[in-house]
C-alpha cells in the first residue's frame, strides 16, 4: 500500500474563543502574474484543538484531517512558539 502524505501548514492563531477550536491565519507570498511584484496572500483555517492548548498569537502547526464539522477539516499538531504576554 502506498502511504499518503499529510499536508501540514504553519500559521498564527487569530482566534481561540471557541471551545476546542482555533482560527489560524496562514500567510504566503505569491508573485503578481503581470507585474511580478511579490504580494502577501492569507487564508484563515479553522482547526480542532482538543485540549485548548493554543492561545491567541501563538505560532502553530496544523495538519489536514477528515472533516470534523462544516468548517473544520484541520487538526492542531503542535504549538511551535508561544506568544509573548
Swiss-Prot record:
Gene Ontology terms: biological process: translation
One Pfam family this sequence matches: Ribosomal_S17
UniProt entry keywords in alphabetical sequence: Ribonucleoprotein, Ribosomal protein, RNA-binding, rRNA-binding
Membrane-spanning ranges: none
A GO cellular-component term linked to this record: cytosolic small ribosomal subunit
PROSITE patterns tied to this protein: RIBOSOMAL_S17
GO MF annotations, alphabetized: rRNA binding; structural constituent of ribosome
Domain of life from the UniProt record: Bacteria
Assembly and binders: Part of the 30S ribosomal subunit.
Function: One of the primary rRNA binding proteins, it binds specifically to the 5'-end of 16S ribosomal RNA.
PANTHER family per the UniProt record, alphabetical: 40S RIBOSOMAL PROTEIN S11 FAMILY MEMBER, SMALL RIBOSOMAL SUBUNIT PROTEIN US17M
Family that this chain belongs to: Belongs to the universal ribosomal protein uS17 family.
Record protein name field: Small ribosomal subunit protein uS17
Organism listed in the record: Acinetobacter baylyi (strain ATCC 33305 / BD413 / ADP1)
Amino acid at each position: 500500500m502506498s502511504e499518503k502524505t499529510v499536508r501540514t501548514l504553519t500559521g498564527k492563531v487569530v482566534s481561540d474563543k471557541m471551545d476546542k477550536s482555533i482560527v489560524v491565519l496562514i500567510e504566503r507570498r505569491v508573485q503578481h502574474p503581470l507585474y511580478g511584484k511579490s504580494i502577501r496572500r492569507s487564508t484563515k483555517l479553522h482547526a480542532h484543538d482538543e485540549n485548548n492548548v493554543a492561545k491567541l498569537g501563538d505560532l502553530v502547526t496544523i495538519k489536514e484531517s477528515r472533516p470534523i464539522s462544516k468548517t473544520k477539516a484541520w487538526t492542531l499538531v503542535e504549538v511551535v512558539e508561544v506568544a509573548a504576554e
